[in-house]
């Protein structure tokens, strides 16, 4: 810098050559200074690393165990995959529903216990958290012209909380509307579902039951997968309560009143519907003793999947 300040006293004919020389020396000095600073920084970093209480040359720790789907999600997806492979399409709908779609159009009488404040979660007058995904059946039948075949997976809500019930649970509704649909078609779909989901040779039986939205109605049992002998018979166990059978869902032929409430002619169209609780099916498939285990998020339990 001092030399550059004295350039004014240098003769004009030598000023150019001396200026170039000064610039060259300046760049060389500044470069050497920068290199030295980098070397000092590296030396300081190396000293810190050598003094560290750990060896950076050691191999990295094993990666954390990979995540996996929750048992409820896995079972739901398995059920949906089976039913979609049988020709059903997925249909979605709201969890906050009007009373008429959740109860009225499904044939529930006004004094049915399910409509009580003690059994359902009401938000405001005429609105509640859906108690089943059958509300999607009403919405689909109101907005789609038959024939149709849908499944409706989703969360549902009821005032229930014990070892086998949860106030929030997941359900899958399956329904088909076409001409000349009979109980034989329903039983065929259920048998194929049980075969694919629970395993080859799983027997299915239907027991008469009552539901407001189907006629006739039935409860569906499958042969207990936990006590099956080599010859196909069941020995009876704690899961099936020594009966050899486990209830998994309710079903039936869609009631004519339901068709009429959706503007569909029951003289021309018929259909079936069935609904299952995903948690219930998961309990059956995996022998889970308490439904609350599915919601406690205990890593020891979830890792078993």
Question: Could you say what each language-model-derived stretch is?
Answer:
Residues 6, 13-305:
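TRNA-recognition modules of translation machinery and tRNA-sensing kinases, especially anticodon-binding
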Residues 1-9:
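Amphipathic, non-membrane alpha-helical rod segments
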């Amino acid at each position: 810098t001092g030399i550059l300040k004295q350039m004014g006293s240098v003769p004009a004919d030598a000023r150019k050559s001396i200026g170039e020389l000064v610039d060259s020396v300046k760049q060389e000095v500044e470069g050497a200074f920068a290199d030295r600073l980098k070397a000092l920084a590296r030396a300081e970093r190396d000293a810190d690393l050598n003094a560290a209480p750990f060896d950076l040359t050691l191999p990295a720790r094993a990666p954390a165990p990979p995540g996996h789907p929750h048992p409820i999600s896995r079972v739901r997806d398995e059920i949906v995959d089976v039913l979609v492979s049988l020709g059903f399409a997925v249909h979605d709908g709201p969890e906050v529903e009007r009373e008429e779609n959740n109860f009225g159009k499904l044939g529930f009488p006004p004094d049915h216990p399910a409509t009580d404040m003690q059994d359902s979660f009401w938000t405001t007058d005429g609105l509640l958290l859906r108690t089943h995904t059958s509300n999607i059946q009403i919405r689909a039948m109101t907005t789609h012209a038959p024939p149709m075949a849908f499944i409706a997976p989703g969360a549902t809500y009821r005032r229930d909380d014990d070892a086998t019930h949860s106030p929030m649970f997941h359900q899958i509704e399956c329904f088909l509307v076409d001409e000349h649909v009979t109980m034989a078609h329903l039983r065929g779909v259920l048998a194929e579902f049980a075969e694919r989901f629970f395993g080859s040779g799983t027997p299915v039986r239907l027991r008469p039951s009552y539901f407001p939205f189907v006629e006739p109605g039935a409860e569906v049992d499958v042969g207990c997968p936990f006590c099956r002998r080599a010859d196909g018979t069941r020995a009876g166990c704690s899961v099936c309560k020594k009966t050899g059978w486990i209830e998994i869902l309710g079903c039936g032929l869609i009631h004519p009143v339901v068709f009429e409430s959706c503007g569909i002619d029951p003289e021309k169209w018929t259909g079936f519907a069935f609904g299952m609780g995903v948690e219930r099916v998961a309990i059956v498939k995996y022998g889970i003793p308490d439904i609350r285990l599915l919601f406690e998020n205990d890593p020891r339990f979830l890792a078993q999947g």
